């Protein structure tokens, strides 16, 4: 399986989970390293756009393609098991992710996207023994269409 993420070109050649460990994220509190990825390039793009400040900021990013072999174990947080309006409650989602990641039972945690609930993000646990089987396939520049930043009249 190939998964995708955008990262600053300074860090696009490494898989460490340091950024999420330092800052926390949707599914992890600070202190727990994790590498956030998405099942498609378009979902990875939506995830990064939700947090981007400007087109100039995006132009510093590269698209990473990460190869996860089929032998890697996976655990899933299912949408139907989450409480109503879970996507507004960072404490709740961080607790859910922490429960899985801290036990170190799996190298891969499948979670619903808070933006597109029917699609999935994959959290890679760099502390799991099977992490060594996961490989960075490529890191390439990505063209972010300027229309993404035009003011919309809706």
What does each model-identified segment do?
Residues 2-16, 29, 57-154:
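Active-site and NAD+-binding cores of ADP-ribose-processing enzymes
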Residues 15-28, 35:
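NAD-dependent ADP-ribosyltransferases
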Residues 27-47, 51, 123-127:
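Extended catalytic/binding region for NAD+/ADP-ribose chemistry, centered on the ART fold
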Residues 53-55:
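Short proline/glycine-enriched turn/loop segments at secondary-structure junctions
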